[in-house]
Amino acid sequence: MTSKIARNLGKSYEKKMYQHLGGMPSTIVLRFSNDTFDEVTKKRYHKKLNQFDGLVLPLDASDETSDTDLQYISASNILRNYANSNRNKEQRVYQELKEYNFWRNLYGTKGIALVVYLLIIVREITLHGTIDIKNIFLNPYPDYVVLILMTLYAVTFVLFVNKQTVIIKAFDYAKSLIEVCERI
């Protein structure tokens, strides 16, 4: 049940991220304005994808229109379906997807986690009454272990679980997904 909640919170953030970025990362990296792939590689991928019925990807930046993103979304869906049905051959894509989903869902639960950590920290401080800073460092066991751990977890969450990490993982997945063009 908690994994479903985490996923729903992560998916909720994902929609906001797509709006902020101007589309899905797999769509963005196919655009000529994006430099994830060099222009020669991008043209080669577009030609390869144009072999699929109904796809007409531009072969030059000047050919991109406002409707081109629909073609890029369709191309991404083709690659995603291929990668999902060939997980044994496309293990890197699957690994990048799992990492992206992990960080997206973790970021989605960040608020809840920080509230829980804060409640535990307040509980520990309340139980001890007065906090002896000297004992926290010199004699932390057993009195201050939970307080120290929860504080470290909260700080770690604040520092490392952030939007930028999720965006980086999203583009890592998008890049590996589009690179499937090399193997189809």
What is each stretch, according to the model?
Residues 1-14:
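Transmembrane alpha-helices and immediately adjacent membrane-cytoplasm interface residues
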Residues 146-158:
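Short acidic, glycine/tyrosine-flanked loop/strand segments centered on an H-E-D-like triad
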Residues 14-91:
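Charge-rich cytosolic interhelical loops and cytosolic tails of multi-pass membrane proteins
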Residues 2-3, 122, 174:
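Alpha-helical transmembrane segments of polytopic integral membrane proteins
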Residues 139-140, 155-184:
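Cytosolic/matrix-facing juxtamembrane and C-terminal tails of multi-pass cellular membrane proteins
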